[in-house]
């Protein structure tokens, strides 16, 4: 299972919060102090909290659970997609569509349409219809791919959300809360930690910090799954130790 040290966090700038005038008082327990009117996050709190979150993600991976990585702002978008793909999970990195979780039935219909367009693009259907119609379908397919491409193979609601910037993704957090889906989230000094089950107090803007969170989370989910695979192989080969 992945773990992250204080040195790793310092190098990535996890400890730099937002300007003091933008703070959310609910983040006070996680703030060490201020320097040049910028809040400094207490990494002595962040390190154990993040490692606890990673241990839980490994358990979800071990149970073959589904983790949905969410980060739609520019600094997080590409890293969110990479983390999800690397861990064979799911992502939303463009725009959170209202009802993506709470109205998943309707979202499923859009995913079905996306998959139909993908088949048509491959099987020659687009060549048999008018150029105008083919162009309209291509544009519709690209738009759907942008919004839903990261969840088109999710087949049901996720078992957890891993969110970069709880404040920016507050709609996703609220939908998960309504459905009882656990939320793991990076929460900066300007954000509200309410509704987050596993709070990771930290910088949610620096690309290096974002990559640190996502790489560790993806590695934890993967290691949980691999443990399960290793156990299955050992059992098959007769190497299970007697208790």
UniProtKB/Swiss-Prot annotation:
Matches recorded under SUPFAM superfamilies: Ribosomal protein S2
Gene3D superfamilies, per database record: Glucose-6-phosphate isomerase like protein, domain 1, Helix hairpin bin
Biological process according to GO: translation
GO CC annotations on file: cytosolic small ribosomal subunit
Coiled-coil ranges (or none): none
InterPro entries reported in the protein's UniProt record: Ribosomal_uS2, Ribosomal_uS2_bac/mit/plastid, Ribosomal_uS2_CS, Ribosomal_uS2_flav_dom_sf
GO molecular function, one term: structural constituent of ribosome
Keyword Ribonucleoprotein set for record: yes
Database matches in Pfam families: Ribosomal_S2
UniProt keyword annotations, A-Z: Ribonucleoprotein, Ribosomal protein
Family statement: Belongs to the universal ribosomal protein uS2 family.
Protein name per the record: Small ribosomal subunit protein uS2
Biological source species: Aliivibrio salmonicida (strain LFI1238)
């Amino acid at each position: 299972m992945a773990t992250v040290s204080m040195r790793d966090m310092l190098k990535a700038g996890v400890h730099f919060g937002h300007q003091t005038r933008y703070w959310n008082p609910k983040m006070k327990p996680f703030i060490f102090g201020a320097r040049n009117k910028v809040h400094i996050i207490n990494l002595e709190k962040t390190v154990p909290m993040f490692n606890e979150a990673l241990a839980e993600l490994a358990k979800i991976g071990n149970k073959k659970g589904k983790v949905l990585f969410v980060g739609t702002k520019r600094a997080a978008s590409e890293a969110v997609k990479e983390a999800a793909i690397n861990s064979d999970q799911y992502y939303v990195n463009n725009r959170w569509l209202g009802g993506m979780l709470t109205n998943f039935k309707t979202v499923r219909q859009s995913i079905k349409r996306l998959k139909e367009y993908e088949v048509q693009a491959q099987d020659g259907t687009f060549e048999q219809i008018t150029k105008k119609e083919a162009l309209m379908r291509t544009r519709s397919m690209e738009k759907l791919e942008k919004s839903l491409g990261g969840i088109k193979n999710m087949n049901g609601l996720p078992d957890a959300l891993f969110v970069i910037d709880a404040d920016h993704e507050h709609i996703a957090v609220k939908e998960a809360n309504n459905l009882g889906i656990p939320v793991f989230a990076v929460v900066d000094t300007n954000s509200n930690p309410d509704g987050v089950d596993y709070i990771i107090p930290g910088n949610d803007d620096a690309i290096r910090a974002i990559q640190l969170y996502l790489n560790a989370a993806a590695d934890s989910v993967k290691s949980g799954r691999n443990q399960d695979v290793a156990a299955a192989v050992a059992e098959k080969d007769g190497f299970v130790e007697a208790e």
